[in-house]
């Protein structure tokens, strides 16, 4: 929420107005029911892709754009609108991927750095990271 508090993002604006690296694909609801940050965070944005399978230790990791488009090495389908935004609750991991892209595009910073600056440090959390792959300094210690 810091980016909303700083007025860099709006909870109720069309996310496509701020997305740069990827756009929510055209769908039958674009004009009258846009996808919003509020909808993404409350799981009412009508976004598909409920979850992600994950990747093996030595498997290549996709970047965020590959995940959103559903292209290799991503192992999930493209993130799309499947129901009218605002019409129903449906958990969607894809919603959080869009929220991540929105933050990264708006702040022009990498997600792990943003989370460190906006969430972890203010909360006093020092032994956690959002970096992938996990840095060796953050791996289990004896």
Please report, for each region that a protein language model flagged, where it lies by residue.
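Active-site SXXK
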Residues: 1-15, 96-104
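Short, surface-exposed loop or secondary-structure junction motifs
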Residues: 27-142
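Short, flexible coil/linker elements and helix-boundary hinge sites characteristic
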Residues: 7-8, 23, 69-72
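Generic hydrophobic/packing signal
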Residues: 2-5, 19, 41-45
